[in-house]
Structure formats: C-alpha cells, structure tokens
Amino acid sequence: MVCVRGRKKQYGGALMKLGVNTVLFKGFGVKAAFKAIKLAGYDGAELSCIAGMCEHLVLDAWETQAPLVLAAAKEAGVELLSMEVASLDEERLKKAFAAANYLGIPIVNVGPGGKADDEEAFQICVKTLRSRAVLAAEYGVKLCCKAHVGGSIYSTPTTKRVIDLIDLPSFGVDMDPSHIWRAGEKPEEALAAVISRMGHVHIRDCKGNGPSPGVPADQTCGRGNINLFGYFKALTDSGYDGPVCLEVIGPEQTMVQAMAIAAESYGYMNACLKQLGAR
C-alpha cells in the first residue's frame, strides 16, 4: 500500500460541475487554457495529460510541474475536476495517480484499448483495468474508463459487462454519450444501465453516426444529432453530481475557435441544466 498525504478533493455538493478538457486549448499553455475556461463560464477543468496529443502536465516531470498547475488553477479560479491520461501503461498511471493525489483531482480517465468483439482482448482489458483500479485506490483516486469506438468496451452492453466484473469502489464509468451514440444507441436511454457506477462524463455533440465525431466545431454541444437535453435530463433525474467535462478532439484550434466552442457549449449545457432545475 502506498501512503500518500493528499489534498482535499475539490468538488462536491448536489449539483453537477461543468468543465472543459484542456485538450481543446492544446495550442496554448495551461495558464491560458484555465483563464479561457473560466472566462467561458465553466466551474473547472479536466487536465489533459495525453502523450502525443496534449500534455498540460507532463507526467514524467509532474513533481516540478504540478505546483505550477495548481497555482495557475488558483489564479484563474477554476477547480481541477479530473485528469485524462488515456493510456493504461502502469508506470505512466502511477505518475498520474500521484500527481492527481497532489493536485486534489479525484478522477483519472482512461480508454479501454483492445479491439471490439474480440473476447481475448476483452479479457485482457478487464484484467488490466482491475489491476489499475487497485493501484488507483492506493493513491486515493478513482480510475474511470469510457466506452470507445473500436475498443474492447464500445457500447452499453460491453460497459455493463465490465462493471459487473470489476466490483471495486476505485473503478467507475466515464460515460461519453458521443461514443454510445456512435454504437447505435440512444445515450439518454442507455444511461440507466450504468449510472450506479458513473464517476465522470465526457461530453460533446456529434453530427451523423461516425465513426468520427466530426470536426471540432461540429462537436460543440447543441450542433449535432445527439439528444443532449434528454441526456442531461436522465443525468438530473438519476441524481448524478459528478463532473461533466467537454472533450473536443481534432486539429489544433486558434484561441478564437476554441473559445467559441467552449462558450457556445457552456451556454447550451447551462441552459439545459437551468431548465431542469440543476443549476
């Protein structure tokens, strides 16, 4: 058991917190990203630590960079709601969990890896996720994994199967409606099957049925075909009170483009939640 003295977790209460994954601002430093996220109206941020895509915290240098990230978040007035690592590499996740503990981040998000409809790959995925969730518990954080197009977990049935097999409090679901939509399901109806284990929501819109979610502008909440109001209603009705973080992927955006996506998405989500009495 690793004994780490961490900071108090930073979110709580009955209402959902809205955030943005800093990958949307991957062309800019973390200070600029946090300031833009706050200016767009959000409560907090998800820290992108995705190697090869966007590392606003370089995990190999987390001990020197984390205090700077913490100071930048405090200066901007944003809460650190979650961290995305994506990778299931054990050594990388050890660093992520240690950094999250220091920063007071309660949730670290990953993808499932593997291959859809391949039983051997699925079993490896389950074994790996279980092992990493046990490790997460040693650092006092929760590992959340989402269904991902093409991965071993790609739909509600495969998600349900995994959570039935990994009955650990340190393991949860990152429910991304765009991936469930691209699996041919209605996210607002699928949520009930996994809500009891949900710890995080990645959110974006999607035009068409995929496999890609579309260009960044088309991932703006309210611009696509997903019934996001219905999804928020299902979240609200369920009593979900975890983070909901906008995650927009694709080519690097200018600050104007990124701010437009963030601000428009916030306006849409905030209006939905106000209509539902959840903000």
Describe each model-derived feature in a short phrase.
Residues 117-119, 151-154:
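Short, well-ordered, mixed-charge alpha-helical segments that flank or form enzyme active sites
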Residues 7-22, 26-44, 67, 74, ...:
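Histidine-acidic metal/acid-base catalytic patches
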